[in-house]
Design a protein with these regions (language model features):
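Bacterial N-terminal signal peptides that target proteins for export
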Residues: 1-12
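Bacterial N-terminal signal peptides
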Residues: 10-21
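Short boundary/loop segments of OB/S1/cold-shock single-stranded nucleic-acid-binding domains
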Residues: 23-38
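Conserved hydrophobic positions within beta-strands
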Residues: 40-44
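Short aromatic-glycine-enriched beta-strand elements
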Residues: 50-60
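Short, structured beta-strand/loop micro-motifs enriched in basic residues and often containing a Trp
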Residues: 74-82
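Short nucleic-acid-contacting surface segments enriched for D/E, G, S/T with interspersed K/R
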Residues: 82-98
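OB-fold/S1-family single-stranded nucleic acid-binding modules
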Residues: 103-133
Length: 141
């Protein structure tokens, strides 16, 4: 093997290794179904202000009183911060209506919550919080 070939091989491997994390990040179309919209009304159970995406967990009670937790993925904390939001913009126990899109695989997350992507969250007072990556417009705070 020539010296130049070895150098090119090592450089190519290093470039691939550096790019792998970027290639691993999912896209909306790969994980969510834009044709399967969902709207749920419930109470915020918890918020996860973590990278690469923040999550809002909402407890939804059905007619029989059974509670189901929905896990709504949103934008990154950085993107939400640039829109003027922070980890305290929504509070645990707050009543909200969430619009979003179902996960394509239909499988719950490890904690059993229903997985979806959030487009917007509407507070009880009617103010909308933009949180998703698929909305056409960003509602004002």
């Amino acid at each position: 093997m020539s010296k130049h070939f070895k150098g090119a091989l090592i450089a190519g491997f290093a470039l691939f290794a550096a790019a792998a994390p970027m290639l691993a990040h999912h896209s909306f179309a790969a994980e969510y179904d834009a044709n399967k919209t969902v709207t749920v009304k419930g109470t915020i159970n918890r918020l996860e202000w973590v990278n690469p995406h923040a999550y809002v967990f909402v407890d939804v009670k059905d007619a029989s009183g059974k509670v189901t937790t929905w896990a709504f993925e949103s934008l990154s904390p950085n993107a939400l911060s640039r829109q003027g939001w922070n980890r305290n913009s929504l509070r645990q126990g707050e009543e909200v209506t969430v619009e979003g899109y179902m996960a394509k695989d239909g499988k719950p997350l490890a904690d059993g919550s229903i997985h979806a992507n959030s487009r917007s969250i509407t507070r009880a007072d009617g103010r909308k919080v933009f949180v998703g990556s698929s909305a056409d417009e960003v509602p004002s705070k």
